[in-house]
């Protein structure tokens, strides 16, 4: 059985992730229509997959020959393509940046739940070969995590005006990092402490964000602590500085060892026996793994919305981290 797809946008990961994955999984997916505001990109993608171009995402979601909607780029649409797919009863795969206020995030979650459609948010760090192998090692060799350090360094583009798209991208990056730590920890955090640094000058832009997640119960600091940071303080015109001694994407100190991940497929870990290095280049690309998972969730008789709750909780944590910075205190987390 092939799933007939409607694509909303092509997004920044189109050439390297989504297009190759859809090509490789042509036995499971068939692209029937594309909605992309930039006409030239729409024409190229439509020609590539021999499909139609559609003027609006609502018309795309309403098509009878579309079984699922793949949102690859939010652009100015925001959550509207997701809601349109829910109204049309179509499954949703969301790779667009997730940046909604608390009320809107709650509304989107409720609308998806009421619609009864399958939903999956794209979190590629979860499905990276190195992450999956780390979960195996935690269960078999390294023991339970105690401390996690998750860092991201992104080149900052020079801008003269408001950078709304950058703000959405920055928030989405944090949402994905938070979800990654939740997944590796295997628990929900109970509190968050956030800190934001704003670059001087006009326009004012955030160039560094940090948060500390505590996974303990009543007594803080007694279980798992995760430190997450995302920096955009190095100009893109300094490529050598950006790539100089980059920190490990994720460092996990466990009961019986420590592990370092460099995405997508390099894992170095240490235990009492010494150093172990694993290169997992032979694993299936992340894009194929995620779309295969989406295919199974849509064709299964059991409805899957696990990604929905994961996305909602990660968004809530980032929002509460921003609140923590504004109020200057640690915030207890409530996901109701």
Which functions belong to the PLM regions below?
Residues 1-48:
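N-terminal Rossmann-like dinucleotide-binding module
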Residues 7, 68-71, 216, 296-336:
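C-terminal helix-rich "cap/oligomerization" subdomain common to oxidoreductases
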Residues 13, 280-292:
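Active-site loop of classical SDR/Rossmann-like NAD(P)-dependent oxidoreductases
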Residues 49-111:
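Beta-loop-alpha module in the N-terminal Rossmann-like domain of NAD(P)-dependent dehydrogenases
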Residues 51, 88-90, 115-117, 220-224:
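A short helix->loop->beta-strand "cap" motif at the edges of active sites that frequently abuts
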Residues 55, 94, 119-121, 261:
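Hydrophobic residues in well-ordered beta-strands that form the structural core
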Residues 99-161:
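A contiguous active-site-proximal alpha/beta segment in oxidoreductase catalytic domains
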Residues 172, 176-265, 289-300:
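Contiguous beta-strand/loop segments that form the cofactor/metal-binding neighborhood of enzyme cores
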């Amino acid at each position: 059985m092939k799933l007939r797809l409607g694509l909303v946008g092509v997004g920044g990961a189109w050439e390297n992730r989504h297009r190759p994955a859809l090509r490789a999984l042509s036995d499971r997916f068939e692209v029937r229509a594309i909605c992309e505001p930039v006409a030239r990109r729409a024409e190229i993608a439509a020609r590539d997959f021999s499909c139609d171009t559609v003027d609006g995402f609502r018309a795309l979601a309403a098509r009878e020959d579309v079984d699922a909607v793949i949102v690859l780029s939010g652009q100015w649409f925001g959550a509207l393509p997701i809601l349109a797919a829910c109204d049309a009863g179509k499954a949703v795969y969301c790779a667009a940046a997730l940046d909604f206020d608390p009320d809107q995030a709650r509304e989107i979650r409720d609308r998806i739940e009421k619609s009864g459609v399958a939903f999956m948010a794209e979190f590629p760090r979860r499905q990276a070969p190195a992450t999956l192998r780390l979960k195996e090692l935690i269960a078999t060799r390294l023991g339970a995590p105690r401390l996690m350090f998750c860092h991201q360094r992104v080149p900052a583009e020079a801008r003269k005006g408001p950078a709304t798209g950058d703000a959405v991208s920055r928030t989405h990056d944090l949402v994905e990092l938070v979800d990654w730590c939740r997944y590796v920890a295997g628990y929900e955090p109970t509190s968050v402490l956030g800190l934001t640094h704003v670059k001087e000058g006009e326009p004012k832009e955030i160039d560094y964000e940090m948060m500390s997640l505590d996974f303990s119960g009543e007594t803080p600091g007694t279980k798992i602590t995760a430190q997450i940071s995302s920096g955009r303080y190095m100009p893109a015109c300094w490529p050598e500085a950006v790539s100089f001694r980059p920190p490990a994407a994720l460092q996990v100190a466990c009961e019986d060892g420590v592990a370092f991940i460099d995405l997508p497929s390099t894992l170095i870990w240490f235990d009492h026996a010494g150093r172990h290095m694993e290169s997992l280049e032979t694993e299936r690309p992340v894009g194929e793994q995620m779309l295969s998972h989406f295919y199974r969730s849509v064709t299964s008789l059991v409805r899957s919305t696990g990604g929905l709750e994961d996305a909602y909780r990660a968004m809530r944590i980032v929002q509460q981290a921003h609140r923590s910075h504004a109020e200057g205190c640690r915030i207890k987390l409530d996901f109701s």
